[in-house]
Amino acid sequence: MTTPLKKIVIVGGGAGGLEMATQLGHKLGRKKKAKITLVDRNHSHLWKPLLHEVATGSLDEGVDALSYLAHARNHGFQFQLGSVIDIDREAKTITIAELRDEKGELLVPERKIAYDTLVMALGSTSNDFNTPGVKENCIFLDNPHQARRFHQEMLNLFLKYSANLGANGKVNIAIVGGGATGVELSAELHNAVKQLHSYGYKGLTNEALNVTLVEAGERILPALPPRISAAAHNELTKLGVRVLTQTMVTSADEGGLHTKDGEYIEADLMVWAAGIKAPDFLKDIGGLETNRINQLVVEPTLQTTRDPDIYAIGDCASCPRPEGGFVPPRAQAAHQMATCAMNNILAQMNGKPLKNYQYKDHGSLVSLSNFSTVGSLMGNLTRGSMMIEGRIARFVYISLYRMHQIALHGYFKTGLMMLVGSINRVIRPRLKLH
């Protein structure tokens, strides 16, 4: 009698989830040792740290986006389109919501998928902390759709400015949140203005753009060493960005932001990039333990505290560190967690002991568009933290994305993609113009 294949279901096709599905597809799916299924509500994957480039148009997502269906076929796993709305731990099934088109017509009814092992890799969304007016008036940058919306509204503002030759004053853009997204977007906006001017947007120069970056903490990039924060702050100031620290936004309306200090920051376009939380529907889903920002609480093995057959990785997981505190929500952590959880699932299948996840901080890098890149590297060679900037930092920053591509495609295909990217930079506009 044939033993039924073990069913491993991964929910969330972000960096960690997709890398894990790819590797398990190679190790188990292709060899018919297990059935691997990836579930995501989107058709394609785009590395989240690139969203600020999609927002300003310096990256065309059509080139870098990866089709889940095509990738699944090539790497030994299956893909299911849809959003998970429930987990039945007793029956070992997840429920996927029905799919409807833009007209509301039913495409796929609600369905259930059985699992033996479930991995939650749903990432995070921006946390507006229930600040009045934010949802209605600010754009979040959590997915490509939101990035495209920002891009279109940005182009419309610049087009209006160019047509009126600045008769209505400057283009005011406010960004709330001095983390990597806010800092990188602030710099990319100035690069966008420079490129649009070269493509014929009359009167559109750096002087026409007024970017305000608002951070509630004492400094921007609070998760990085102070010297990195200072270097980034200095570079942004040189570009003309107004950086406000220790400034809390209390509400937003159509025309701008209200701060706790009583200042009103006028803005034609507002972005909220302050804080993160796991998706709201995760709160106590399936009776699993969650924290105040909806993250699934996990053991050091990355298994959820109330079910050893359910793992959580990446930003949606609250994982304690032996020295105290929790694993930070960063791309390198998601990558490391994916590898650890995969190895533990394989060990679980073979009756071997599981290993605890240990976060290794390899440093952080922040790209200030074409103007500069700053960051720190950490490791055995440096015996601590070493600050890097300029071309070396830019090379390492780009290498992080290449490592993600290699994990998904291998060296040969990644090399071909780099070649195609080089060709596109020659034949395509430097900025997406529509």
UniProtKB/Swiss-Prot annotation:
Bilayer topology: Peripheral membrane protein
Cofactor: FAD
GO biological process: aerobic electron transport chain; aerobic respiration; anaerobic respiration; copper ion homeostasis
UniProt-listed SUPFAM superfamilies: FAD/NAD(P)-binding domain (SSF51905)
Cellular compartments per GO CC: NADH dehydrogenase complex; plasma membrane
Residues the record lists as binding NAD(+): 176-181, 275
Function: Alternative, nonproton pumping NADH:quinone oxidoreductase that delivers electrons to the respiratory chain by oxidation of NADH and reduction of quinones. Utilizes NADH exclusively, and electron flow from NADH to ubiquinone does not generate an electrochemical gradient. It may also contribute to copper homeostasis and bacterial oxidative protection. Shows cupric reductase activity, and catalyzes the reduction of Cu(2+) to Cu(+) with NADH as electron donor. Exhibits Cu(2+) reductase activity in the presence of either FAD or quinone, but is unable to reduce Fe(3+). Contains thiolate-bound copper.
Name recorded for this polypeptide: Type II NADH:quinone oxidoreductase
